[in-house]
Design a protein with these regions (language model features):
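N-terminal Rossmann-like dinucleotide-binding module
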Residues: 1-44
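Short amphipathic alpha-helix with an adjacent loop that forms part of the alpha/beta core around
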Residues: 72-82
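Donor/substrate-binding cores of folate-linked one-carbon enzymes
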Residues: 85-201
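N-terminal beta-loop-helix "entrance" segment that forms/cooperates
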Residues: 40-58
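Internal anion-binding site segments
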Residues: 195-296
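Short, structured coil segments at secondary-structure junctions
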Residues: 27, 60, 102-103
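Glycine-rich, highly charged phosphate/nucleotide-binding loops
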Residues: 63-74
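Hydrophobic beta-strand scaffold residues
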Residues: 31, 63-64, 107, 135
Length: 296
């Protein structure tokens, strides 16, 4: 009986957990080490909190290493052996060529887009933000250039008309785990990306969530809300916009936008207040609603 395929797994957020779980559940693979970002302070108490990947790995009894800088600390770390594969899923650090050369077979990455589309840090959000009808996951052989490696496998899905980043996250994290297992279970057949068709998505900031009813259509704002809530969030002045639609909804307020479009806000949160429905906002903040409708 052949030995299981050895894996060193790099990942940090919830998106990476299904891929790690799938590898752990399949006896053809052996996850020998998990590398994750250091524990981070979270919430008002700033309590140091482990990543979802670390939590899962510890539950499975897998050794976890959390270097501040993988590239700087890699050479000094003692590895029991070189793995067959280095699997990277939303790790959160750019890895050096030294790290990429470490596995015997290949370094592979699960990326949440149909490469070469949406290379970069925020493919989930941008698929929704740009109104894409289709998205998916790519397993790529990693190279130094970001998300530019040969494609080892792809799987696509159609996006729902009301898709959100949260719903797409769950779909693609599951799909990515399935595709990862299928890809690593068979001989690799790399296909070079068409760099001429590459598109890119930047790391999001709070500035990406600013909206203006006088310069944006209802569809554009609605996509922002579905893409950017909860992070980095969507704001008009000091008011967080939490949920919207482009069709009339119960308990909503209607706001006119450019090109004679209307946005229906169903949930929002004034600064320092709890989230509320559109109709509750209308009753409690009539003056602010007037400014919102007037574009002030």
């Amino acid at each position: 009986m052949s030995s299981p395929i050895s894996i060193v797994f790099c990942g940090t957020p919830e998106f990476a957990v299904p891929s790690l779980a799938a590898l752990c559940a399949d006896n053809r693979f052996s996850v020998d080490l998990v590398i994750s970002q250091p524990d981070k302070p979270v919430g008002r108490s700033q309590e140091l909190t482990p990543s979802p990947v670390k939590i899962f790995a510890k539950e499975q009894g897998i050794e976890v290493w959390q270097p501040e800088s993988l590239n700087k600390e890699f050479a000094a770390h003692h590895f029991a052996k070189r793995p067959d594969f280095l699997v990277v899923v939303a790790y959160g650090q750019i890895v050096s060529q030294q790290v990429l050369d470490f596995p015997i077979v290949a370094p592979v990455n699960v990326h949440a887009s149909l490469l070469p589309a949406l290379r970069g840090a925020s493919p989930l959000q941008h698929a929704v933000l740009l109104g894409h009808a289709q998205s998916g996951v790519t397993i790529q052989k990693m190279v130094r250039e970001l998300d530019a490696g040969p494609i080892l496998g792809q799987s696509s899905i159609e996006l729902d008309s009301r898709e959100t980043t949260a719903s797409l996250h769950d779909k693609l994290s599951t799909l990515g785990a399935q595709l990862l297992i299928d890809t690593l279970s068979h001989p690799l057949h790399p296909i070079d990306q068409d760099n001429g068709k590459a598109t890119f998505c930047h790391k999001l900031t709070r500035d990406d969530g600013v909206i203006n009813f006088q310069t944006m259509t209802a569809v554009e704002i609605d996509r922002k809300v579905r893409a950017l809530v909860p992070w980095p969030g969507v704001k008009w002045n000091d008011i967080k916009i939490l949920a919207t639609d482009v069709a009339p909804q119960a308990n909503s307020i209607a706001i006119s936008c450019v090109h004679d479009t209307q946005l229906f806000i169903t949930s929002l949160q004034p600064d320092g207040r709890k989230p509320m429905s559109g109709t509750d906002f209308e009753r409690g903040y009539p003056e602010m609603l007037g400014k919102m409708k007037g574009g002030l």
